[in-house]
Amino acid sequence: MFRTFGIAAAALGLMGAAPADWRALDPENTLVLETTKGRVVVELRPEFAPKGVERIKLLAREGVYDGLQFHRVIDGFVAQTGNPNNRDGGTSRHPDLPPEFSFRIPAAAATVVVERSDAREGFVGATPFQAVSAAEQALRPDPRLRGWGAYCPGVVGMGRQADPGSANSEIFVMRAAARRLDHEYTVVGRVVAGGEAVQGLAVGEPPKVPDLMLKVRVAADLPESERPRLEILDERGRAFREHVESLKRANGAAFSICDVEVRSRVR
């Protein structure tokens, strides 16, 4: 099940977390969805998909997402929304976007937590990624890390049609891990609060009574009093590293990057 942990749950495994282990969200890259099941907060990561993130913020600022249905919600898979016609295939007035299925970023911008002979895995902010192995990277003239978003629970992607370059306005939230989507759909960020609301959405294709995105805003555009007052466990900090190591010990060979769930607290 997809969960986001608030401070009460987080404290169970993070008693030693210091103030420096937490970080604030960037209001310009935080999307706030007011839904019929409650508030959902998404941390957008332009490092993964600058054009996709720019488009989603533009549509939020234009009010395109307000009132749209979660028109396809599948248990153990995804919740889709964002089409102005409230069904698959709808688009905004803006042109389709090129695929952003992989990225290249400075290695210092990423936190690697798993090193294998065939790949590396880690986080940029709260969003998980997989990257080529260090050995393969060393063979390339470009020193930047080459990776792609990992479709773990809570990850947000852009929907499309059969054409890889047909992403436009549709977004979807993973209700469970589906790594087969890696390299196939643009990753734009991850839910950092409100996972319970995503899990509570009415299920169906379409649901009999669909839930709605009542209002979608970029946090920077909200009055200070209405912005999410959240801090996220910093993936670059000691407490995060210790948390990941504890999961590795507990899960052994079965450990997956998708086992690492978002930890947040109210500030």
How would you name each of these model-derived features?
Residues 1-6:
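Bacterial N-terminal signal peptides that target proteins for export
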Residues 7-16:
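Hydrophobic alpha-helical targeting segments used for export or membrane insertion
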Residues 16-267:
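Cyclophilin-like peptidyl-prolyl cis-trans isomerases
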